[in-house]
Amino acid sequence: MSEPFMNAPWQPPGDHPALKSPQPTGILIDSVRKLYPARKASAEVVALDDISLNVPKGSILGVIGRSGAGKSTLIRLINGLDKPTAGRVVVNDVEITSLDEPALRRARRSIGMVFQHFNLLSSRTAFANVALPLEIAGTPKAEIEKRVLPLLDMVGLADKRDRYPAELSGGQKQRVGIARALATEPAVLLSDEATSALDPETTDQILDLLKQINRDLHLTILFITHEMAVVKALADRVAVIEAGRIVEEGATFDVFATPRHEVTRRFVSSVTGSGAPDWLLAQLQPLQPPGGKAVLRVTFKGSDASQPLLSRVARTLGVDLNILFGQVEMIAGHPFGTLIVSLDASPDVLRQVIAQLSAGNNLVEQLGYVA
C-alpha cells in the first residue's frame, strides 16, 4: 500500500451506532455536517446533516440517493477536496479533516478515485494516463513501468497500452480510469457514478472488475450511485441518503429484504419488482366488491424463498391461491422472492392464510381486492 506519512492524531469513533464495528475501519465519517452559506438571493444550503458511517477495511459500501441528496458532497469530503463544517473524516486511520495541504497531498496517495466521465487526458495513451499520478508523485521511470503494465493487464487492457482515449470504447476508458486510480497502491477506492455513462453489459463488466479488485487487493471501496441495481450487484452494505441525511443503512440483503424508509422502498421496488405491476395496480380496489378476491403480496427471504409454502397453506386451509405475479432472485448471495396472489376467502380464513404465510422471515401485506 502507499508509503507512510505523518498524520494528525486520531481518536476512536464516538458513540453513534453507525460507528461501532468489530472490524478495523477503512473509512470513518463521524457526525459530519456541511453547510454552504447564503449568497445574495440564495439561502443557506445544508448539504450534509449529521452523517455518520463506518466502512470496515476490505468491504464495499454503496451510498445511494437521488440527485441533490448529498452524495457528491460526501465523496468530496472523503478525498479531502472540501472540508466539513463540523465532524471528522478518517481514511485508513488518518484524520483527513485536520491535515494541512502538504500532508493532505500525501494522504491522497492512499485514496484512489474513479470518475463518472473517465477524466482521461486525450493527448496521452492508456499507459501514460495510468502513469500520470506516479509521474506527479516523482516515481522513477523504471518503477512506473513496473507498476503500470501489471495494472493494464489486471483491467484487461494489456494490448491497448498505446491507444489514445479516442480509440477506446466507454468501458475501456473506464478500465483505464480504474487502473489509474490503483497506480499509487491506495488502501481506499472511491467511485463517483462510475457506471452511469455505460451500457448495461459494460456496466456488469465494470462491476465484476471492481469486485475482483476488492477480492484480490483487499481494497476498501465506497461508491456513490443513483442506481439500486449497482448496489445489488456490488455492495456488501448500503447507505441511503436523502436531503443530506442517512435515512437507512445496513447489510445489502437486509436493506433489500426489509426496507424501512419510503425512499429505500422506492429504490428497492425499482430493482426487485417487489411493487405490484401497473396492470394490477389499475385493478386494485380498497373495498371488496361483490364476488371480489383479496390480493396479498408475500415477500420471501433467505431459505424461505425455496419452501413450498403456498401449496402447504392451500392444502391446510382448503383455499385456492391464484398467482398473479412473482419472481425470485439472488441478492448478496441470498435468495429473495416476491409473490402476489389472489384468493376468495372469508375474513376469518383470510386471517389464517396471512398468519400461515407470515411464518419464518416472510412478510405478508394485503394490497386490496380485485373483482
From Swiss-Prot:
Keywords: Amino-acid transport, ATP-binding, Cell inner membrane, Cell membrane, Membrane, Nucleotide-binding, Translocase, Transport. Its EC number is 7.4.2.11. It catalyses: L-methionine(out) + ATP + H2O = L-methionine(in) + ADP + phosphate + H(+); D-methionine(out) + ATP + H2O = D-methionine(in) + ADP + phosphate + H(+). One of its GO terms (molecular function) is ATP binding. GO terms for cellular component: plasma membrane. Residues 1-22 are annotated as: Disordered. Its main location: membrane. It is a peripheral membrane protein. The keyword Transcription regulation does not apply. Pfam families: ABC_tran, NIL. It is found in: Cell inner membrane. ATP binds at residues 65-72. Residues 27-268 form the ABC transporter domain. The complex is composed of two ATP-binding proteins (MetN), two transmembrane proteins (MetI) and a solute-binding protein (MetQ). Belongs to the ABC transporter superfamily. Methionine importer (TC 3.A.1.24) family. Part of the ABC transporter complex MetNIQ involved in methionine import. Responsible for energy coupling to the transport system. This is Methionine import ATP-binding protein MetN.
